[in-house]
Amino acid sequence: MAKTVLITGANGQLGNEMRLVLDGNDAFSPIFTDVQELDITSKDAIDAFFANHHIDYVVNCAAYTAVDNAEDNVELCTRLNADAVEYLAQAAKRHGAKMVQISTDYVFNGTNFRPYREDDETSPCSVYGSTKLDGERLLLQCLPDAVIFRTAWLYSPFGKNFVKTMLNLGRTKETLSVIFDQVGTPTYAKDLALAIMNVLKAEQWHSGVYHFSDEGAISWYDFTKAIHRIAGITTCDVKPCTTAEYPTKAKRPHFSVLDKSKYKTTFNASIPYWEDSLRECINRIENK
């Protein structure tokens, strides 16, 4: 019998990729919701939804992800990234459902010189990172057997993201300045969706925190250069700049590369190199 999977935030980048990877998979019966169908910041709405649906798995793709705006919208950011996670976890626990939560590399302060492991000390330097870490803690207090994926620099053909922005700017601007002293790894949302499917399809449930991004490491500047190279954009001069030269409201980690060893070992899985996934995504965007 097909297992029912509740996907929240279904209209976002990851939610849309989950639609595609679940399409035609007879082992799962997905329920896709966004704020119109289910307001996850309302405990009553969640409780009513669970009372009316049998749920085996919850995959929470909903979040407040506007990192700079979060500095001025602490309450809303907290409601979506922490309180809502707790409400979903409480409902999942009462109804015997398993839960997958998406978190972020921004739970770290970026002072490491090696890729971050799951047990490294967390120390977020932004409201966004702090609320995502609060969400992790609230989830594990309520549902210790949950799965948490910390990911980074998410992009896809859907919604607003860095890749689509740089494609647009590359075609409309003569020059661009992009930060070169923040290093991390981009994550193609499709790759993360497939990783979540590996969790759901596994013969046994492997709870815990996992780091997931594509393979490799790169700066925002070099990422932009790669986006333009792959898309054949030659009319825009991309210049490197420092974080100090481009101040933002929220502080960001200078180094947030994630160590994916635990995920790869646990699920016997390989992860694509960031440039291969970027090429596929740009292909999808350009051929829509």
Residue ranges and their predicted role:
Residues 31-42:
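Rossmann-fold cofactor-recognition segment
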Residues 219-225, 242-281, 285-288:
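Conserved C-terminal active-site "lid" loop/helix of NAD(P)H-dependent oxidoreductases
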